[in-house]
Amino acid sequence: MRFVVCLSREGFGEFSTDDLTLGRLYEVLAPSESHDMLRIIDDSGEDFLYPASLFEAVEVQEKTATRLHELLAA
């Protein structure tokens, strides 16, 4: 499991960032084919691709990652 924190909501042309919260932790879903995009479940509850530059990776222990996954999925 991989987690990121949102550090920017700067617009990227066609990408709306209205459903992102600065400072919020998001779980990265299946890896995208493009290394500069991340698929996350945003604040709307739907999964979308966002530019990776809006986020910073967060390293957590496996036990913590499992608990975060369960909490974010609820």
Question: What name fits each language-model region?
Answer:
Residues 3-5, 9-54:
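Basic/aromatic-rich interaction segments and small domains that mediate binding to polyanionic partners
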Residues 52-73:
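C-terminal structural segments of small proteins and small subunits
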Residues 1, 73-74:
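Intrinsically disordered, low-complexity and often Lys/Arg-enriched segments
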